[in-house]
Amino acid sequence: MRKLLLSCSKIFVLCSFLFGIFPDTYAAVPVQDSTRTDTTSSSLNEPLQKFQPLKLNVLYGEQTRDRLVQSIGYLDGKRLESSPVTSLSNAFAGHLSGLYTNQSNGAPRYGVTSLSLRGRSPLIVIDGVPRYNEVYSELSLNPEQIESITLLKDGLSTVMLGNRSMDGVLMITTRNKSVSSGSTVSFTAQGGIQEAIGMRKGLSSFDYASLYNEARANSGLSPAFSQTQLDAYRNGTDPFLYPNVDWQKTVLRDNAPQMRYTLNAGGNYTNVRYFLSLDYQNQSGLFREDDANSYGTNVDYSRYIFRSNIELNIDKNLTANLNLVGNIQDFIQPGSGYGNIFALLQATPSNATAVTNFRGTFGGTREYPNSPYAEAVGTGYIKNNLQAAAVNVGLTQKLGNLIEGSWVKALLSYSPSYEQRINRSKNYNAYNYPVTGDTNNVLRVSTISEQPNSTTVQGRFQQTYLELSTGLDRSWKNNDFSAIVLASYDNSQSNNTLNEIYQGISTRLSYSFDKRFNIEAAGAYSANNRFAPGNQADFYPGAGASWNLHNESFMQGNKFLNELKLRASYAKVGNADPGYYLWRQTYASGSAYIFGTAATGTSSIAQGALANPNRVVEKAKKFNLGLDLAFSKQRGWINVDYFNSSQYDMLQTRGSSSVILGSAYPLENIGKSRYSGVEINSGWSATAGKLRYSISGNISSVSSRVLFNDEPTQQFAYMARTGNPVNQIRGYVADGFFNPGNLTSPRLEGFTPTEGDVRYKDLNGDGIINVMDQTVIGNDKPLLYFGANLGLQIAGFDMNVLFQGVENRDILTIGNYQFPFNLNGQGQAFSYNLNRYTPATASTATLPRVTIQNEVNNYLTSSLYVQDASYIRLKNLEVGYTVNPKILPSSVIRGLRLFVNGQNLATFSKYKDADPENYMGLYPLQRVINGGLSIKL
């Protein structure tokens, strides 16, 4: 059944890609207005047949679709509102081609999604200001505050950022109005239930003890558990002396609530446009609590956001913008830390100790003094409070009375944040009662401590950003011309470090002839103060062109094609990663030296890692080639992009340097690599009677190659990293297990194999397994990631479905969660560990024999532990109903919509041991079922 569902999901994704809508390069917008006219309606409550060219946001300006040369992805903010997420980045998956997402942690506040754009982590720009701190990006926005997401992919679209242009840009534009004219107020209330997904299942006490005895026998030791004890574990006759604790069920709740309330007000008048938003959300954690405590110990995350965006026409030529945002966050967790508790859940076996003893005290042993339950409810709590604000002030002056189409702009932004931690953590009493039941021989394994009440500063951050620009926009006959010259100054300071300053001058020139030919050139000269003098500044140029073939005379008779455009761009871009003044040699306290006959040590100062005064900005040469196609009255379209990024001056430590120096070598600009790939979007929208429908698909591929990394000359070609993918998994190639028929096969140096141990391929044929037999063991195919969306609307009902997935993704599953009894002979074991080698399971075993001692041979990094973590996920589903306005009291309520949505609803993957994204045993991802209503007043 699972294979059938997986096949059906792949078919749906393929069909969506072939016949989809809403490609992220273009956005379908109604002719009458490109803003949302009804905050209570779904994105399908808009005309789907008639469209006009959309002005897309580009860096420091706008550009019409027909003049576009750059490679840009676009997403209407409305598309994110169906995702019941508490961190904005968790809603991006599957929407934008070229943007790879991975969420490896599901914890409230900290469960943000990592983003990768064509192999690099993109810079976040919000309302024109670069943001480096998640406080001002993922955690400072909710979907209802967003007007659009713009993804700047190629070098030409980002080159004006100079030494910050290499990684691409995810540009967020917040709303400045809610309606096409007049004013409106809307309120949305929603609440949902979270439940953990993809957690490993630990063994029962009986299975654990049986496997433990087997491991001791394989290590030549006597059994640890007698048959009487095994029977007691299986029968559960004495839960105190022979516990069988499901720690996950004991520590974690089946589900946890989350809620969000949003009040928005907006207006659009001749001289003023505004958007005001007040948002509160709360996300509870999964931990159980003890009613005996007078305080909460569960994870709890609350966030308050206030946003005010105002645009004012002071006169016909002068416009002012004022954006204010305030962000307050409270985060509570158990005193021992939520991460520590989940680590214990992965490491504590079911028979380690009783949850509580028969006297009601916490249980514990010498081997397991800290039970997951005691750590969750008995260690007090820690509370973090964060307060952040940002203010943007902008002025735009038109200078048409001097030079037609000219203007000047100024933007000033100031953003401070402050976080403090209140520590009320403590220890607890835990006791071990011996298996004899002798209550007079009780061992205390943990002792209670006083509960402090201390406050410490966790972090300070402030950013000042200043931007001055002037430009010209002119059109005459068949010519369109625009130009901009811009100077920027970005000063940020974190905690007690010295300020980091980015500053530069940039320009862009765009010319269009006869709506057929478009050319664009841009450049930036930028600097960073943390490089050595002489290496702080560099110049970054870029250029591109596009050709609208559908406007050529030989295409005029074609009524089917509405758009056919070729695009190409090339740019030199940079990535400033200066570190903290690493060009300056540092010294620190060293070991004590003894002089003379006295045994008194004298303090010393030692040289730190070698400095590199020649360190410069990492760079890349980016090439992009694109095709844009729209057809059938713009009901369908296809966009294709090919990119190639040749990176050089990449920072790395030399691999060919001698290790006898006695000091760490510095990072140097010697690395070279290449990223390339293809991105395809397709779309279709139409109506069938009263049914409106849309279907979309996007798929992206990215591959990488190491071109140079200064590795030592390898004796065998298969050992080289050069020519293989960047960050490729390397290790030994597993070749099954040793059995009585192959015990003389090549083995690890100094190791005598036993039946059931891992056998490795002797790649160089010398009869010995050593470092000379290590090679690439991961998948070297291009990484594929994709999204597919289906939208339906009829008779007030609407539905949106989003699938998202990844192919050709390998993970390395090594660590304490993979290897049983790997903590000095202790530790948890999981259901998949039962697939170990025994003489009876020799033909089906997927893991080596179990042992108590750390058998190095069996736990080496090898292909045995490389898993295919490709997956397809039903990422989001929403069903809504918009009440007919005719039956509403129009004097009070102008619109009402009810909705139910869900996130992470189903996952289909070959990897069964855990969630394919969150496989390291961290706070689990959650399936969310959410419902609510939106009211427009």
Predicted regions and their residues:
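C-terminal extracellular loops and terminal segments
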Residues: 665-674, 713-732, 771-772, 776-791, ...
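Conserved active-site-proximal loop/helix segments of enzymes involved in bacterial cell-wall
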Residues: 652-656, 769, 817
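Calcium-binding motifs, dominated by EF-hand helix-loop-helix domains
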Residues: 759-763
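Acidic carboxylate motifs that coordinate Ca2+ or other divalent cations, activating on Asp/Glu
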Residues: 766
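Short, solvent-exposed beta-strand-terminating loops
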Residues: 194-198, 419-429
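Extracellular/periplasmic, surface-exposed regions of secreted and cell-surface proteins
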Residues: 309-318, 323-328, 334-337, 345-348, ...
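Membrane-proximal, glycine/serine-rich, low-complexity loop/turn segments characteristic
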Residues: 2-8, 14-17, 22-114, 118-131, ...
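Extracytoplasmic gating/loop element in the C-terminal half of outer-membrane beta-barrel translocons
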Residues: 224, 348-358, 374, 753, ...
